[in-house]
């Protein structure tokens, strides 16, 4: 999108569309809970979504009309991510149904470890590819084509995975009361409220990060790839560490500590300029350490709150609130940047971006403190339930 010279707001919006597209997940239970077997439907969603997103790179070969290309890219990315968000709900429930509750956390840790290793290698290699082609269209063509091949391979492998039969409601119907059940669960409702405000506060600035690094701080793709590799390597290194901490201190401890470490990345970004670009090497360390524990713990935590039945509705509400927050976030970030003052001194070069990161840090810290550092009596509710 930066290559196509899109507007800052469109870049921020589409850059985050993979997250906010999950809003439609709220309707997923009406389909998934009527299906005993979901694999063929999920694979169809998988392939269609990836084909739409990966194929945007071929648009300049079809037309030279810049307005048409931008419109087509926007439609294909949004539609592809909407389908992917719908797929994500079903695939996550499928994945979690393959393991017992006792083995769940260990399975999530091992799976995440391998995912992070693959992400690290891929992001590093693709950054090198872009720089080898001098950030030209050919470089993007190679990357997106490679991604398309990997996506098709992934679908073929997925077709070989065993699928347990899903227990559907008597008569094959699924009611509105079943879809609304997560909102009646007080603990899960509290978790949903946290999810909304936590991701809203972070995404209102993070949705503009790639734009800020490339267009304003003027970093090359190799350096950005190094930053991503540092984050992913740190996550890989800390995955097993957080797993040991969880066994000793509990899931709640991991959540409340790792959440704080995550948002420290945004504090560092608030001081990032062309002059201070080297501090960017510290930001992924906090991101890697924090997300190394938080992303796994938040998945385990929400599945601990869910009953064994009707998980699609619970996962759907999580996806919907997460998606809604990330849809609103770029607009909120854009609004704040129009209001924030232009300052130019030794600390601030692009003050509107930098102050936005600082606001993200402050608001997200407040959300974390309210959720995880409330009076001891409230915290013990979850701890006691774990022991039970």
Regions inferred by a protein language model and the residue ranges of each:
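Short amphipathic helix-loop junctions that connect adjacent transmembrane helices
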Residues: 1-10, 207-224, 341
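Helix-to-coil boundary motifs at intracellular loop junctions of multi-pass secondary transporters
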Residues: 3-4, 34-35, 94-98, 212, ...
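Substrate-agnostic recognition of the 12-TM MFS/MFS-like secondary transporter fold
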Residues: 14-29, 42-49, 72, 76-137, ...
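Multi-pass alpha-helical transporter architecture, strongest
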Residues: 24, 56-61, 150-162, 353-388
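Juxtamembrane helix-start motifs in multi-pass secondary transporters
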Residues: 40-44, 143, 250-257, 356
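C-terminal ends and interior cores of transmembrane alpha-helices
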Residues: 46-67, 131, 260-275
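Juxtamembrane intracellular "pre-TM" segments in multi-pass secondary transporters
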Residues: 163-193, 216, 381-388
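C-terminal transmembrane helical hairpin of 12-TM major facilitator-type secondary transporters
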Residues: 253-295
């Amino acid at each position: 999108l930066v290559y196509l010279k899109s507007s800052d707001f469109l870049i921020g919006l589409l850059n985050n569309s993979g997250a906010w597209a999950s809003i439609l997940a709220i309707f997923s239970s009406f389909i998934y809970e009527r299906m005993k077997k979901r694999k063929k439907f999920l694979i169809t969603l998988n392939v269609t979504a990836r084909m739409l997103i990966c194929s945007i790179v071929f648009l300049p070969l079809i037309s030279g009309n810049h307005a048409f290309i931008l419109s087509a890219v926007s439609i294909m990315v949004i539609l592809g991510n909407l389908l992917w968000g719908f797929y994500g709900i079903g695939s996550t429930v499928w994945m979690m149904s393959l393991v017992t509750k006792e083995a769940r956390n260990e399975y999530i840790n091992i799976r995440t470890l391998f995912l992070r290793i693959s992400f690290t290698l891929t992001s590093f290699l693709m950054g090198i590819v872009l720089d080898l082609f001098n950030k030209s269209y050919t470089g993007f063509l190679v990357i997106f084509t490679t991604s398309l091949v990997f996506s098709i391979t992934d679908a073929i492998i997925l077709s070989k995975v065993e699928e347990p039969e899903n227990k559907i409601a008597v008569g094959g119907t699924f009611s509105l009361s079943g879809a609304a059940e997560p909102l009646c669960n007080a603990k899960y409702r509290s978790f949903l409220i946290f999810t909304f405000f936590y991701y809203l506060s972070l995404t209102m600035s993070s949705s503009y990060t790639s734009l800020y690094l490339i267009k304003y701080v003027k970093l090359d793709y190799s350096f950005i790839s190094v930053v991503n590799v540092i984050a992913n390597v740190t996550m890989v290194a800390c995955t097993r560490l957080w797993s040991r901490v969880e066994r000793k201190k509990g899931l709640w401890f991991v959540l409340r500590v790792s959440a704080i470490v995550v948002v420290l990345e945004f504090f560092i970004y608030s001081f990032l300029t062309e002059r201070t670009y080297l501090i960017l090497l510290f930001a992924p360390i906090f991101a890697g350490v924090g997300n190394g524990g938080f992303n796994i713990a938040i998945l385990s935590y929400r599945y601990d709150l869910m009953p064994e039945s009707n998980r699609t509705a619970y996962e759907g509400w999580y996806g919907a609130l997460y998606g809604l927050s990330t849809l609103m976030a770029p607009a909120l970030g854009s609004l704040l940047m129009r209001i924030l003052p232009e300052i130019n001194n030794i600390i601030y070069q692009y003050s509107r971006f930098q102050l936005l990161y600082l606001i993200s840090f402050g608001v997200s810290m407040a959300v974390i403190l309210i959720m995880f550092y409330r009076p001891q009596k409230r915290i013990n509710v979850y701890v006691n339930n774990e022991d039970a």
